[in-house]
Amino acid sequence: MAMKTSHVLLLCLMFVIGFVEARRSDTGPDISTPPSGSCGASIAEFNSSQILAKRAPPCRRPRLQNSEDVTHTTLP
């Protein structure tokens, strides 16, 4: 019984060490998305040693084609 327990503990320890090492490795930029309803695209943030690349396009509303469309739109 003690032999099986030590094997389980060893496997758990190896898993934890592997998980921590995997989190430390640089796998690329962290991609975050803005909250829903806000204008802008996702923002890619690199580590402080790299360039911060942030780009958000301006908000655009579709143009109304004629005066009839005004009655059917809701303004925020």
Curated annotation (Swiss-Prot):
Induction data: Induced by increased levels of photorespiratory hydrogen peroxide H(2)O(2). Transiently up-regulated by cold stress but down-regulated by heat stress. Induced by the necrotrophic fungus Botrytis cinerea in systemically infected leaves. Accumulates in response to salicylic acid (SA, benzothiadiazole (BTH)) and jasmonic acid (MeJA).
Superkingdom of this protein's organism: Eukaryota
Keywords tagged on the record: Apoplast, Cell membrane, Cleavage on pair of basic residues, Endoplasmic reticulum, Membrane, Plant defense, Secreted, Signal
GO MF term list: LRR domain binding; receptor serine/threonine kinase binding
One record GO biological process: response to salicylic acid
Tissues showing expression: Mainly expressed in young developing leaves, hydathodes, immature flowers and elongating pollen tubes.
Propeptide residues according to the Swiss-Prot or TrEMBL record: 23-35
Self-association state and partner proteins as the record states: Interacts with MIK2 (via extracellular leucine-rich repeat domain); this interaction triggers the formation of complex between MIK2 and the BAK1/SERK3 and SERK4 coreceptors, and subsequent BAK1 activation by phosphorylation.
The name this protein goes by in its record: Peptide ARACIN 1
